[in-house]
Amino acid sequence: MGDRPTPVPLPNSEQFYLENDRGEPYLIQVSWPLHWEDKQTGRGPLPIIYIVDGNALFLTATEAAWRRAAASHFAGGGIIVAIGYPLKGKLYDARRRSFDLTPPTACAPVGYGGADVFLDFIENSVRPAVQARFPQVSLAREALYGHSYGGLLALHALFTRPQSFDCYIASSPSIWWNSLCILHEAKAFVETKKVSHDQSPSLMVSWGSWEQHPPRWADELLDHYEARKRTAAELRMADNALDLCAMLHGCSRLHALIKTEYEGEDHTSVMSCSVSRGLTMFFEDWPFHQSG
C-alpha cells in the first residue's frame, strides 16, 4: 500500500516465447478465469480461444471474459491464448503479420502468403505448449479468432482445415485481399461433400457499419474525407462479408453461420465488439443454433 507507483499487475495470466521453424520468435500470452486460485487444479471440460494479433487484443479479450463472471448466464469462462510478436512501443508488426495472416496463392505478392506455415505453428507448437501448462484441465472445444488480415486467416483455416477448430471467428475479414482470392477457397469448400460424421464447425462473421459507409469526422477536411470514403467503397467490407455469407448459406459443412454488423463501429473500434461477442458466445452459448 502507499502512494509509491508500481507496475499494474495482471493476475491469472502469463506469457512466454516460442520460435517457429525459421527461428522467428512469437509472444504467447495466456489468461484463465479470475476465480481460479491456481491453474493446476483439475477442471473441465473448458473452452479455449486462440487470438491472433495478440499484442492488440490480449487485454481486451481477457477483460471481456473476466467481466462475464458478473453475468447471469456465466458458464465458468475459458482459456484465452493470444499470439503476437515481441514488440515495444507498438501493437503491430506489419511485415510479419502480412506474411503470417494471408493465404498462399499462385500470385501472392512478395512478403505475403504464409498462412499455412503460421497455422502449422499454432497447431504443432502453440497448442501443445499451452496444453502442457494446464495438465489438469480438459478441453471441451477450441476457437480461432482473427481481425482484418486475421479474419482472412480464420476463413482460410476454415476452408482448408475445417477440423482444426470447432469455431472460426472472422472479424472484418480482408476478403478484398489479392483480388478476392479467398472466395475461390470458399467455393471449393461449399462444393466439397462432407465426409466425416463429426460435428461440423461453426463460423462467425462480423464487421462495423462505418467500415464501408464512414461518416465525416467533425474536424476532417473534405478532401481527406472524400478520399477515405472512396477507399471504403472500394474495399466493400460489408458487401464482401454479406456476399461470402450468401455463398455459405445452407452449406452442409457448417454447423452454424452467424453474421453480425455492429452499428457505428469502424475497422478499429469494431475489434472490441467482435472479440467480446465472439468469446462470450463461444464460451457460454455453445453449441450454436444450427443454420437452416
From Swiss-Prot:
UniProt xrefs under InterPro entries: AB_hydrolase_fold, Esterase-like, Siderophore_Hydrolase_D
Keywords: Cytoplasm, Hydrolase
EC number(s) given by UniProt: 3.1.-.-
EC class of the enzyme, as a word: hydrolase
Listed result of changing S174A: Decreases activity towards TAFC significantly, tripling the value of KM and reducing Vmax by 50%
Annotated Gene Ontology cellular component terms: cytoplasm
pH dependence: Optimum pH is 6.0-7.0.
Entry note: thermal dependence: Optimum temperature is 25 to 37 degrees Celsius.
Chain residues that bind triacetylfusarinine C: R97, S148, Y149, S174, W176, H267
GO molecular function: hydrolase activity, acting on ester bonds
Domain of life: Eukaryota
Induction, as annotated: Expression is induced during iron deprivation.
GO biological process, one term: siderophore-dependent iron import into cell
Pfam family, one: Esterase
Main location: cytoplasm
Assigned protein family: Belongs to the esterase D family.
Description of its domains: Ser-174 seems to provide a hub for substrate coordination, potentially playing a decisive role in recognition and selectivity.
Protein name: Siderophore triacetylfusarinine C esterase
Organism whose genome encodes this protein: Aspergillus fumigatus (strain ATCC MYA-4609 / CBS 101355 / FGSC A1100 / Af293)
